[in-house]
């Protein structure tokens, strides 16, 4: 008895903004053509992010890889044609157009670890970096410009060096109180 070929992960390029629909269509095509044994998971890796709009905290999802869908599958002519026949699929990434290359196990592990880390804590939608120029939009230092010194994603706070009367003064601010320069 021969062992079934191993399912590997492939990256499929989709029209940007249609990743979810492509993933859903692909799942439906797999069922419709009775090819479940050739396919594993089909996913669009996302993370939950928090953005502050109009003073309100809102949760939304951000895609790790906009424009791409990850597909676990056994690569053969039938599975290749099935994926390529799904509307809004532009093709596979890696390898050649007729012989796509799977992503490495190391890359798969990195993606899965990132998905697990994301699990509980939503991240801020806007990411700040030390040295970046920001403008204070709220509070006693509104309309002042400053430079980010430290970022605390756990507490959603920044330490910003603001120039007050010609002197650089460190000020602790909430993410909602600043906007990118």
Curated annotation (Swiss-Prot):
CDD domains, per database record: KOW_NusG (cd06091), NGN_Bact_1 (cd09891)
Query: Which terms are listed as keywords in the entry?
Result: Transcription, Transcription antitermination, Transcription regulation, Transcription termination
Q: Which InterPro entries does this UniProt record tie to the protein?
A: KOW, NGN, NGN-like_dom, NGN_dom_sf, NusG-like, Rib_uL2_dom2, Transcrpt_antiterm_NusG, Transcrpt_antiterm_NusG_bac_CS
Q: Which GO terms describe its cellular component?
A: cytosol
Tell me the domain of life.
Bacteria
- Which stretches make up the KOW domain? 130-161
Q: Which SMART domains match?
A: KOW, NGN
Biological process (GO) annotations held by this record are:
DNA-templated transcription termination; regulation of DNA-templated transcription elongation; transcription antitermination; transcription elongation-coupled chromatin remodeling
Q: Which Gene3D superfamilies match?
A: 2.30.30.30, NusG, N-terminal domain
Describe the function of this protein: Participates in transcription elongation, termination and antitermination. In the absence of Rho, increases the rate of transcription elongation by the RNA polymerase (RNAP), probably by partially suppressing pausing. In the presence of Rho, modulates most Rho-dependent termination events by interacting with the RNAP to render the complex more susceptible to the termination activity of Rho. May be required to overcome a kinetic limitation of Rho to function at certain terminators. Also involved in ribosomal RNA transcriptional antitermination.
How does this chain assemble?
Monomer. Interacts with the transcription termination factor Rho and with RNA polymerase.
The UniProt similarity line reads:
Belongs to the NusG family.
Name the UniProt record assigns to this protein: Transcription termination/antitermination protein NusG
